[in-house]
Amino acid sequence: MASVNGPLRVGIGGPVGSGKTALMEQLCRRFRDSYEICAITNDIYTKEDARILTVAGALPEERILGVETGGCPHTAIREDASINLAAVAEMRRRFPKLDLVLIESGGDNLAATFSPELADLTLYVIDVAGGEKIPRKGGPGITRSDLLIVNKTDLAPLVGADLSVMEADTQRMRGTRPYVFASLREGHGADTVARFIVEAGGLG
């Protein structure tokens, strides 16, 4: 099923603790029986996120590759994406029929974006626990990602966040670009994200 242009590469970014790894796990579980898939994770000094996915059984260990960026995490996905491009090339060597590569950035800030050379689609994850004001702060991840995921909606009552305000701000900042409100630990919203990837990414 692999495209002649190579696998679809989906970049998943967002601040530390927003739920990127939870989303990676949910997507791996949804896609692994239908597509040739692998996952690449970025951490500054460890391969912790890769370990989490492996322990969770999201994919076989050989389909998960941890990248240690050793510095500013957004540099490894934007200004100098060579370490991640090399990781994609390695996975394509291991699995020549790859359909889909999920690339999780290291915890980054609201200004971080993926290089178009690295990712065909970009998803950005923020979380309700970060505060009601997060969507209105803007930044490329919030305003220009192909899909914005507002995660941990279940925590809204605990942190005093008004989801209707967050949604209004999200709509204002993104215009017509799509977004999803989710609670990924419970699996809520993951199907919508998976469907978006299939449709927007042209997966057959």
UniProtKB/Swiss-Prot annotation:
InterPro entries: CobW/HypB/UreG_nucleotide-bd (IPR003495), P-loop_NTPase (IPR027417), UreG (IPR004400). It holds the Pfam family cobW. GTP binds at residues 14-21. Keywords: Chaperone, Cytoplasm, GTP-binding, Nickel insertion, Nucleotide-binding. It is found in: Cytoplasm. The keyword Chaperone applies. GO terms for cellular component: cytoplasm. Homodimer. UreD, UreF and UreG form a complex that acts as a GTP-hydrolysis-dependent molecular chaperone, activating the urease apoprotein by helping to assemble the nickel containing metallocenter of UreC. The UreE protein probably delivers the nickel. This is Urease accessory protein UreG 1. The lineage of its organism: Bacteria, Pseudomonadati, Pseudomonadota, Alphaproteobacteria, Hyphomicrobiales. The gene is ureG1.
